[in-house]
Amino acid sequence: VMLELCTPVIYGSPKVAAYHRKSLDLPTNFSIVNTAAEAAHNRLSVVNCTDDEVKVEFSKPDPEAGKAAWGALEKAIEEFREGLIDVIVTAPINKHTIQSEGFAFPGHTEYIEQRLGNGSKSLMILMKEDFRVALVTGHIPVREIASSITKELIQEKLVIFNRSLKQDFGI
């Protein structure tokens, strides 16, 4: 069904994608491309973002994996800016391994906001079928949530959520 709705492009390492496909016994095939412009319709494509050997061990954080995740995110942002892709959907990242001199953000949502926001604020939306939840706060410790929520922040997030529901979801 997904291939009928869009042309999915994964940014990362084809070797890592193949490892996960094999480990999880997924019947999915993909094309390896250098840019989303080369992505084939009706087929999953992987944009090769690194030629480095990335060690993959499930549930074991690795700084090289963090570096690869940042590189993939940066390539997706670049191709979004170029108009090669319409949407960026991210998977969870390890917030500790991605931290570096150039990436000092609590999470990739804040990073994307800084790289693409032009001063606009982001909104994290979780959804399942017809159910959508928007988060008022981002990646902050639980002890800081109450002091971070203000009337102004709630209003700001509601305006963004309302616009997204109309523009992105046709509600």
Q: What is each stretch, according to the model?
A:
Residues V1-H108, I149-I171:
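Contiguous, glycine/small-aliphatic-enriched amphipathic segments in soluble metabolic enzymes
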Residues F103-V142:
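Flexible loop/hinge segments that line or gate small-molecule binding clefts
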